[in-house]
Amino acid sequence: MTLSDMSALLGCLIGGGMGFYAMLRPSWASQIVRLQATPGLVEGKSEFRGTYGGLFFFSHALAAYAIASGLEGAALGAAILGAGWFGAGVGRVISIFLDRAWTGLNAFNVGFESVLGALLAAPLIVSHL
């Protein structure tokens, strides 16, 4: 296993860990993304468990399995997840400028999403150097 594979596994652990915790504690996911479910409607809680929980956990878990098993295409799969994280950071930068949303939290999140994207994309990037 290469250093870039271990980097991607760390990214999977972080993203998947966040997803797993969001499935267990949707209120935590709500706080992290600064969104609230509509009071009195249970579908909002289901959305946090499903999207921020299940989607994040299972996509990162499968990428981790593929990397750890050395499956063909694992680097591309992890890089696709990385592109999603990087894209979230780009969208946040756009919001910082267009919406005048410069805050310490937004700055931190841009860095976090960019680093996580780089960790996940590392095997694909290294394989093409």
Role assignments for model-derived ranges:
Residues 5, 101-111:
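Non-cytosolic membrane-interface motifs at loop->transmembrane helix junctions
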Residues 5-24:
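N-terminal signal-anchor transmembrane alpha helix
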Residues 44-47, 107-121:
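Small-residue-rich segments of transmembrane alpha-helices in multi-pass membrane proteins
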